[in-house]
Curated annotation (Swiss-Prot):
It comes from Xanthomonas axonopodis pv. citri (strain 306). GO terms for molecular function: electron transfer activity; protein-disulfide reductase activity. Its main location: membrane. One of its GO terms (cellular component) is plasma membrane. The keyword ATP-binding does not apply. It comes from the Bacteria. This is Disulfide bond formation protein B. It is found in: Cell inner membrane. Pfam families: DsbB. Residues 29-46, 89-145 are periplasmic. NCBIfam families: PRK04388.1 (NF003354). The lineage of its organism: Bacteria, Pseudomonadati, Pseudomonadota, Gammaproteobacteria, Lysobacterales. InterPro entries: DiS_bond_form_DsbB/BdbC, Disulphide_bond_form_DsbB, DsbB, DsbB-like_sf. Keywords: Cell inner membrane, Cell membrane, Chaperone, Disulfide bond, Electron transport, Membrane, Oxidoreductase, Redox-active center, Transmembrane, Transmembrane helix, Transport. The gene is dsbB.
């Protein structure tokens, strides 16, 4: 079974399942391995959740028209692009020299109680400290690096599924 030959619905369902699996693993790591997510990790989770929603909506709707598939492909690509940006920022924070580190600041729950949403977003994206800690690695890559890999892969998958020319079932 070649997933590149699957229907749009099946391809978008696979994208949804990938996002759901990644979110489930993040929750497992938090609850069972005791790794608390930093604010940038939480924003990456939100981006994966938004991407999952677009993949699921596309899979459930399964538009027949090419324009509809392209819309879902672009929306998913945008969600993945936002996630890529957040993950890239997180990777940058992690690879900075130690002497450039500063505190990440208060927890996200405190920030959301004391600031407006745009201030929270700006504060989190300029934070460093705890966000710079690398507590988990797999094959030499940190979790934000793996998030970046997944965001890139899912962005390309969304574009492929959304823009793939599909043969009509009607023969001329």
């Amino acid at each position: 079974m070649n997933p590149f030959r699957w229907s749009f619905r099946a391809q978008f369902l696979l994208g949804f399942l990938a996002c759901a699996g990644l979110l489930a693993y993040a929750i497992y790591v938090q609850l069972h391995l005791g790794l608390e997510p930093c604010p940038l990790c939480i924003f990456q989770r939100i981006a994966f959740a938004a991407l999952a929603v677009f993949f699921l909506l596309g899979a459930l709707h399964g538009p027949r028209a090419a324009a509809g598939r392209k819309v879902y492909g672009v929306l998913s690509f945008i969600a993945a692009g936002v996630g890529m940006g957040i993950a890239a920022r997180h990777v940058w924070v992690q690879i900075r020299p130690k002497d450039m580190m500063s505190s990440c600041g208060p927890p996200l729950s405190f920030l959301s109680e004391t600031m407006g949403p745009f201030e929270v977003f700006r504060t989190v994206l300029t934070g460093t400290g705890d966000c710079g800690n690398i507590d988990w690695r797999f094959l030499g890559l940190s979790m934000p690096m793996w998030s970046m890999v997944w965001f890139v892969g899912l962005a390309l998958w969304a574009l492929y599924a959304g823009f793939k020319v599909r043969r009509s079932s009607v023969h001329h």
